[in-house]
């Protein structure tokens, strides 16, 4: 152990105490043993350190910081070097604010476009997600503090996120949901990783030995600290035994007593506690030393400029009929849309940054050389019809050469704690677009949203620019793109389906109960659409430019792909070269093709460049459930190089030596998985892939019952709590602004009451409440009162001992 000398100075109670937080974002310290307390902070696209009363949802104000574009935005740059720059800037700001651990980036696979937190995640593809996340981690940790990639693992929804069970086969787990994390661990060596709230195949992620020990620590060699998501610990002792280091936020004395009792009963050993403590001490001592040495200032203007460049390089030009963009200098433009005045530039929840400053499109246009004919809001942000606003916008559109129409999703559509109900743009925005286009066909739509949308309205605009959620400088970046100061080079990091009904997980996403069946298996995003032959609106990797590019001279080996890329247009630009691997006629079923390498290549007009893209150990492998390892199917593979997953420019074959492993699916009838048509996989085939019966879903009145399930309790108290929460939730929907506190409570299991209240509520009190909800009113009430008195006495005694030791 690295910290054996310090550990030897501590008694068992002190050791156990250090393995849980002291406050919402602080760890416990032990000054007599030389152990300082450190501060952790959100978030993935900027620092959210709260100066006063702290909460994990972003409800209370935080210290001003740079709000960079969200991960979903920067992923469209396909530029790890840019991600590393952003990470370095965030690390610098975190250290300046005395934050030792920055809780990000998030790299959960975008299983469905409806996940309300997709704006925080990079991509539907694990290779792209992993490469971008690794870059962020390297940047953050270059400042001496710790990055904390999250949420490990298979955490793809917000509904019942603290109690849902993600059920999937081992191959899908390894190839699709863990590969991104594997890349981060092996290429960036994060000092911490955050475990997810959910269960994975029946066991909570934070106490899942298969995830934390077998895979994370043994297979990948991770030696850092695993931190729970806030309130995400189910069984603290099992977590410690199976590889979880630090329980957050502040469970109080109950967590300490739980570990002490577990050691005394033999459930865990003191050696287990020491192993976790060694990981924690390494984190605390290394990062606290770095923070102490760091400057307490940073260059806010330089970071704003970086945020603007990042947003500009990530913007995706989806349509440009007749080359209407870029706009000519002096063009007279009408600016329409509420988002031009009040931008949507980040998502809601724990990632929300108190931005140092925020650009608006109106302000930035005034400095662009364009003439502004005027501004009209045009629509109500929350979707309510407003004929007067629409009429004003139509009248303005007639007075301009070009209309800049700013559309997008409002705050209630994309938030932590809440999944989207559809992929649609609000009706009032679509109606406005149709009316404006009739008044002025030269309509350019600027779209702000953190995830994909249905676009049946696409014919009503001449150009469409996707700015995603561009951060505090996103509006300035958009003006740079619209005017041609920046040539858009971004490409989509997720497929845009024609309709939600055509997405692979449409019948299984979020689940009807606690059990969430990942029946689609490997076929997520482009892996599904291209294998099953389903047309899409915009394919994965798609994006236009103000110039054009040619591909030539392809050379392929088992280790690399080399080609020449030429800018054949009149403008400087950047092309994102994408390499996909396919195996026609494969014996082991697999997607039609998979991304295995990419590079962003800047080129001056007329310039040619030779590009070499390495193929790593992930290029040809698959997970074999019979050998329980990575294998390679031997034979001829096709290497496809293109400008998107659907725009393949060059191909070449390469022969690869296989490992001659046994077919893991021999004797199994899996027609839907072999064809990729996985929307309606029958139970028998799903069970054959899983290797066991489908888990039965049943709401149980226990510690893990969520407050949103209390209508199933046997108690008027439970029904009342559920009714009040539901009413508050519906009220926030009507206001168009998510009530994050209510959303969290609605999806929160009862056990979290003991994990999120700084020791005020013990698990014994929760058990008494459960008895009440089961219908045992008197016994339950007596238990709650008894446990409350006991908890207060024990907490006071513990704190006295810890202060005196």
What are these regions (language model features)?
Residues 1-622, 636-641, 645, 720, ...:
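Glycoside hydrolase catalytic-domain context in secreted enzymes
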């Amino acid at each position: 152990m690295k910290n054996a000398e310090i550990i030897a100075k501590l008694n068992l109670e002190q050791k156990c105490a250090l393995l849980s937080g002291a406050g919402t974002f602080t760890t416990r310290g032990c000054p007599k043993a030389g152990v300082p307390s450190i501060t952790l902070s959100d978030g993935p696209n900027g620092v959210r350190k709260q100066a006063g009363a702290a909460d994990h949802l972003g409800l209370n104000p935080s210290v001003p910081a740079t709000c960079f574009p969200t991960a979903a935005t920067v992923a469209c740059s396909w530029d790890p070097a840019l991600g590393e720059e952003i990470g370095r800037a965030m690390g610098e700001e975190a250290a300046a604010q005395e934050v030792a651990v920055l809780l990000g980036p998030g790299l959960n696979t975008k299983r469905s476009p409806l996940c309300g937190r997709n704006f925080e995640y990079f991509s539907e593809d694990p290779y792209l997600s992993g490469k971008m996340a690794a870059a962020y981690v390297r940047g953050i940790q270059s400042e001496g503090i710790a990055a904390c990639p999250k949420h490990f693992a298979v955490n793809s929804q917000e509904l019942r996120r603290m109690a849902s069970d993600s059920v999937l086969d081992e191959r899908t787990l390894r190839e699709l949901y863990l590969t991104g994390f594997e890349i981060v661990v092996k290429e960036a060596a994060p000092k911490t990783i955050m475990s997810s709230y959910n269960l994975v195949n029946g066991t909570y992620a934070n106490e899942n030995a298969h995830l934390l020990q077998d895979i994370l620590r043994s297979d990948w060699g991770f030696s850092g600290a695993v931190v729970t998501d806030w309130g995400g610990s189910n069984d603290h002792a099992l977590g410690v035994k199976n590889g979880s280091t630090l329980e957050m936020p502040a469970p109080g004395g109950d967590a300490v007593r739980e570990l002490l009792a577990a050691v005394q009963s033999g459930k865990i050993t003191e050696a287990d506690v020491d192993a976790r403590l060694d990981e924690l001490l390494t984190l605390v001592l290394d990062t606290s030393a770095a923070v102490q040495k760091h400057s307490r200032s940073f260059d806010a203007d330089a970071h704003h400029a970086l945020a603007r460049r990042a947003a500009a390089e990530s913007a995706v030009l989806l349509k440009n009929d007749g080359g209407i963009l870029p706009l000519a200098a002096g063009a007279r433009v009408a600016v329409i849309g509420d988002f031009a005045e009040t931008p949507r530039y980040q998502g809601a929840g724990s990632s929300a940054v108190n931005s140092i400053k925020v650009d608006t499109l109106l302000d930035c246009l005034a400095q662009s050389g364009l003439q502004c004919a005027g501004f009209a809001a045009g629509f109500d942000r929350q979707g309510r019809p407003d004929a007067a606003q629409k009429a004003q916008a139509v009248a303005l559109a007639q007075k301009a050469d070009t209309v800049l129409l700013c559309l997008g999703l409002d705050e209630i559509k994309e938030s932590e704690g809440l999944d989207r109900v559809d992929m649609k743009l609000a009706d009032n925005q679509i109606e406005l677009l149709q009316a404006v286009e009739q008044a002025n066909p030269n309509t350019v739509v600027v779209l702000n949203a953190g995830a994909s949308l249905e676009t049946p309205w696409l014919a009503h605009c001449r150009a469409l620019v996707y700015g995603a959620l561009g951060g505090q400088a996103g509006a300035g970046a958009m003006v740079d793109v619209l005017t041609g100061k920046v040539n858009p080079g971004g490409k989509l990091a997720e497929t845009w389906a024609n309709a939600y009904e055509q997405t692979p997980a449409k019948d299984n996403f979020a689940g009807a109960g606690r059990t969430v069946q990942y029946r689609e298996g490997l076929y997520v995003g482009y892996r599904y659409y291209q294998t099953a032959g389903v047309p899409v609106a915009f394919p994965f990797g798609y994006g236009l430019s103000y110039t054009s590019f040619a591909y030539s001279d392809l050379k392929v080996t088992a280790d690399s792909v080399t080609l020449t890329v030429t800018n054949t247009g009149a403008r400087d630009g950047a092309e994102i070269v994408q390499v996909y691997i396919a195996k026609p006629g494969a014996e082991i079923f697999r997607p039609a093709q998979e991304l295995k390498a990419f590079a962003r290549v800047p080129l001056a007009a007329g310039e040619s460049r030779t590009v070499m893209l390495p193929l790593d150990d992930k290029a040809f492998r698959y997970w074999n459930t019979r050998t329980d390892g990575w294998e390679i199917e031997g034979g001829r593979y096709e290497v496809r190089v293109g400008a998107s997953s659907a725009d393949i420019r060059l191909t070449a074959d390469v022969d690869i030596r296989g490992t001659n492993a046994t077919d893991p699916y021999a004797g199994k009838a899996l027609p839907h998985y072999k064809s990729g048509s996985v929307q309606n996989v029958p139970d028998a085939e799903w069970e054959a892939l899983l290797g066991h019966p489908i888990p039965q879903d049943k709401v149980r009145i226990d510690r893990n019952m969520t407050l949103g399930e209390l209508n199933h309790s046997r108690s008027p108290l439970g029904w009342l709590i559920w009714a009040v929460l539901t009413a508050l939730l519906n009220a926030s929907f009507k206001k168009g602004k998510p009530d994050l506190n209510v959303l969290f409570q609605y999806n929160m299991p009862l056990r979290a009451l003991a994990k999120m209240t700084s020791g005020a509520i013990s698990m014994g009190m929760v058990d008494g409440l459960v008895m009440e909800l089961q219908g045992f009113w008197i016994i339950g009430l007596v238990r709650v009162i008894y446990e409350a008195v006991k908890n207060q006495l024990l907490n006071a005694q513990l704190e006295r001992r810890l202060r005196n030791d």
